[in-house]
Amino acid sequence: MPQYQTWEEFSRAAEKLYLADPMKARVVLKYRHSDGNLCVKVTDDLVCLVYKTDQAQDVKKIEKFHSQLMRLMVAKEARNVTMETE
């Protein structure tokens, strides 16, 4: 289970993992108040990518990452619907 030290590396690897098989990929966001740590996991049951942070500025990056994944999901669904109707 590789734990990434930089956000850029993690986000690139997580996006690749999602694009490899969107139906198997999951994203888990976990916050521990006692430690003040935020943990993001992206997995497809074979590979598990982890990024942990205690910096408030990383929350914006994580929010942007989630919206990027949502856009990828919607774009993929829209393509599937148009292919089914044709």
Curated annotation (Swiss-Prot):
The answer to whether UniProt assigns keyword Metal-binding to this entry is no
Q: Give the sites modified to N6-acetyllysine.
A: K52
Q: Which UniProt keywords apply?
A: Acetylation, Cytoplasm, Ribonucleoprotein, RNA-binding, Signal recognition particle
InterPro entries, per the entry: Signal_recog_particle_SRP9/14 (IPR009018), SRP9 (IPR008832), SRP9-like (IPR039914), SRP9_dom (IPR039432)
Subcellular location per the Swiss-Prot or TrEMBL entry: Cytoplasm
Q: What biological processes does GO assign it?
A: negative regulation of translational elongation; SRP-dependent cotranslational protein targeting to membrane
GO CC aspect terms? cytosol; signal recognition particle receptor complex; signal recognition particle, endoplasmic reticulum targeting
One molecular function GO term is:
7S RNA binding
SUPFAM superfamilies linked to this entry: Signal recognition particle alu RNA binding heterodimer, SRP9/14
Q: Does the keyword Metal-binding apply?
A: no
What is its quaternary makeup? Heterodimer with SRP14; binds RNA as heterodimer. Component of a signal recognition particle complex that consists of a 7SL RNA molecule of 300 nucleotides and six protein subunits: SRP72, SRP68, SRP54, SRP19, SRP14 and SRP9.
Family per record: Belongs to the SRP9 family.
Q: What does this protein do?
A: Component of the signal recognition particle (SRP) complex, a ribonucleoprotein complex that mediates the cotranslational targeting of secretory and membrane proteins to the endoplasmic reticulum (ER). SRP9 together with SRP14 and the Alu portion of the SRP RNA, constitutes the elongation arrest domain of SRP. The complex of SRP9 and SRP14 is required for SRP RNA binding.
Q: What is this protein called?
A: Signal recognition particle 9 kDa protein
What is the scientific name of the source organism?
Homo sapiens (Human)
Q: What is the lineage of its organism?
A: Eukaryota, Metazoa, Chordata, Craniata, Vertebrata
Per the record, the gene is: SRP9
